[in-house]
Amino acid sequence: MKHIHKIKNYAMVGGLGVMAVFALNACEQNSGQNNALNNTLQNSQKNGAFVIVEEQNDGSYKVLEEYPSEQTRVMLKDKNGQERLLSQEEIDELIKQEEVAIDSGQSQLTNPNGGGLGLGGAILASAAGAILGSYIGNKLFNNPNYQANSQRNYKSPQAYERSKNSFNSAKTGASGASKTSSGKSGFFGGGNSSQSTSTNRNTGSMGS
């Protein structure tokens, strides 16, 4: 519980990242639990995300925890337990590298065997990826392998459920305001928010 409290405190800290909010074009959804978190994230308009990605002993990465936040930030926890916030430039470069892997069919996000994720893949698998990587969202959300593997990208089923519940609660709290909005709900596609995508995308220079 102390660890969870610490994470929530991080999520309240002022930002390093730049949040962009996007709308999602309606797309066909498969049934089953693995779609539940994706649906929740897509409908969490006006919420950023604070995400902790943890390095595993084999060098792969999983989503450890994530919470709604006013701004979108990603914290990396390495296998030695050291934590640091990733810069926006690092995040942008990692997402760009993972996009290349997706386009070439080499990304574990869309691999039917669902192997271990690299850091960029873990970021895209998280709520932060749904926001910051929204410009490649259709490549993932319309991919059946990504849908099937979504839960295993988290450290545990409990982490997956905590994320789903956190973003559901945030969505419920914001429902009153959303009724007055003419925009579509969700992260991807449409509306003025798409302008924020090109404004906020940086070209980071971090190596892989």
Curated annotation (Swiss-Prot):
Name the residue ranges with Low complexity bias. 169-185, 193-208
Membrane topology per the entry is: Lipid-anchor
- Pull one GO CC term from this UniProt entry: plasma membrane
Q: Where in the cell is it found?
A: Cell membrane
Q: Does the keyword Cell cycle apply?
A: no
Covalent lipid sites (S-diacylglycerol cysteine): 27
Q: Does the keyword Ribonucleoprotein apply?
A: no
- Which residue ranges does the record annotate as region Disordered? 148-208
According to the record, the signal peptide region is 1-26
Lipid modification N-palmitoyl cysteine sits where? 27
| This protein's UniProt keywords | Cell membrane, Lipoprotein, Membrane, Palmitate, Signal
State the superkingdom: Bacteria
Query: What family does this belong to?
Result: Belongs to the UPF0323 family.
Name of the protein in question: UPF0323 lipoprotein HH_0014
Q: What is the lineage of its organism?
A: Bacteria, Pseudomonadati, Campylobacterota, Epsilonproteobacteria, Campylobacterales
